[in-house]
Amino acid sequence: MLMTISGGRWNGPIWDTHIHLDLQARGLSAAQDFANAGGTHICLVHKPSFSSGLPKSIEDVDHAYRRTLDLAESVRRNIGLDVRVVLGPHPVVWEKQIHTLGLESSTQLHLDSVELALNYCAEGASVALGEVGRPHYSVSDEIWSAANAQLETVMRMASQAGFPIQLHVEDNGAKTNADLGIICDR
């Protein structure tokens, strides 16, 4: 596809590089609105369902990932958008699960979920791992330290598998970027 401006109008692809679709909210109508506005491509990022309960097992995670993949296919078929999928365990899920599963079990489920998402990447069903990162709100020093250690492990896993990550981090500008740079340099 030739990408140019013709008659004052862009005729190339128009991407939403980070969209969550929630079937319990607007679902496909949000994708339809994007297409109606001229959108051509979306990067559908897995969104955990906080309202229907967080996963307690890797089987629960797999079921949630498959729902995201099914949703992507539905958007392709019904709306006609080009859809790329990003799968991964959200850091807020990990932090919330600490309070019910404990730090060790929550962390293990998170890392198992990363491995599962990377398997979907290797199969071609997903293009990246995400959202992974840190909680975007204040947590205890212990949880913050664990989040940083876990993020380093997740980054290493993605790097070794050869897939990009989509980060979920707090909004703290230069400090956040500097912190992430330190983690990347290890």
Residue map of PLM features:
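Mid-domain alpha/beta scaffold segments of enzyme catalytic cores
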Residues: 1-163, 167-169, 173-185
